Amino acid sequence: MTNTIYNKNIISISDLSRSELELIVATANELKQNPRPELLKNKVVASCFFEASTRTRLSFETAVQRLGGSIIGFPDGGNTSLGKKGETLADSVQVISSYCDAFFIRHNQEGAARLASEFSSVPVINGGDGSNQHPTQTLLDLFSIYETQGTLEKLQVAFVGDLKYGRTVHSLTQALSLFDCEFHFVAPKALLMPDYIIDELKEKGCKYTLHETLDEIMDSLDILYMTRVQKERFDETEYQHLKSSFILTANMLKGVKDNLKILHPLPRVDEITTDVDSTPYAYYFQQAKNGVYARQALLTLVLTNEFGDL
């Protein structure tokens, strides 16, 4: 397979075709089984976080280092010239991109990564832009699903919780729609999946259902994707009302399919109780670990032609 990801901006999961997603998953699997600590030797990658992050930033920087690359950047954009001196994002990107071979950005404003790609002289990878897209999270989700199910095809997938602002569920739904999966959206009315995602599913002829409880679909699921209500996107009164809308307990897992796996982009608050952690269905910590391999795969394919023949 030709590596069409080489030197490409990765802003939205919709920037990637089905074959490209399959190539990334295959590359992640190869790098997990056979580490390659020299692939990014002499490559410099900028890691620029204008919004708080733990797992995304650390797994991305770990991915660069384990491939032999070097990192420049910052974990808090508030302490940069953009944050302190009023420099524009466009100017910051033009300067920083002149120092590196790839530019990884997280920002709290929707569209910031796309804007960065217009001014960057090197490929831009979106690490999350507001409530819009989070494509690298989607890649580790796809890898985790493939790893546990042996396929991405024709799966029964439920998304639960904050589907309105949860950028991870937007991106993953778009990706899995390329693999003929059936979707079940479980959310309170205030947090329903955005209309544009539903419209895309309709256009593609994908099956989906809407629910306010998990009970009626639990026994049919292959993947249960839980999300937290994102406190940073609500005022305190609304957050307190919504935060406990859906809580998964171990008792709710009676009668589920043997192959069911529970995923969560983390951090969790109280939407998955700790008694679920010890069940054979919990996979969210392994999922987080897979972030390193998925981001290694993406970096390798964007910056080299090493795995184009997988």
Curated annotation (Swiss-Prot):
User: Has keyword Transferase?
Assistant: yes
A single GO molecular function term of this UniProt record: aspartate carbamoyltransferase activity
Residues binding carbamoyl phosphate are R55, T56, R106, H134, Q137, L266, P267
InterPro entries named in the record: Asp/Orn_carbamoyltranf_P-bd, Asp/Orn_carbamoylTrfase, Asp/Orn_carbamoylTrfase_sf, Asp_carbamoyltransf, Asp_carbamoyltransf_Asp/Orn-bd
Q: List keywords of the entry alphabetically.
A: Pyrimidine biosynthesis, Transferase
Write the Enzyme Commission number(s) for this entry.
2.1.3.2
Q: Provide the binding site for L-aspartate.
A: K85, R167, R228
Name the Gene Ontology biological process terms: 'de novo' pyrimidine nucleobase biosynthetic process; 'de novo' UMP biosynthetic process; amino acid metabolic process
Provide the catalytic activity annotation.
carbamoyl phosphate + L-aspartate = N-carbamoyl-L-aspartate + phosphate + H(+)
According to the record's subunit comment, the protein's assembly and interactions are: Heterododecamer (2C3:3R2) of six catalytic PyrB chains organized as two trimers (C3), and six regulatory PyrI chains organized as three dimers (R2).
Could you tell me what this protein does?
Catalyzes the condensation of carbamoyl phosphate and aspartate to form carbamoyl aspartate and inorganic phosphate, the committed step in the de novo pyrimidine nucleotide biosynthesis pathway.
Family membership, please give it.
Answer: Belongs to the aspartate/ornithine carbamoyltransferase superfamily. ATCase family.
Which HAMAP family does this UniProt record tie to the protein? Asp_carb_tr
- The protein in question is named Aspartate carbamoyltransferase catalytic subunit 2
Q: Which organism is it from?
A: Shewanella halifaxensis (strain HAW-EB4)
Question: What are the leading ranks of the lineage?
Answer: Bacteria, Pseudomonadati, Pseudomonadota, Gammaproteobacteria, Alteromonadales
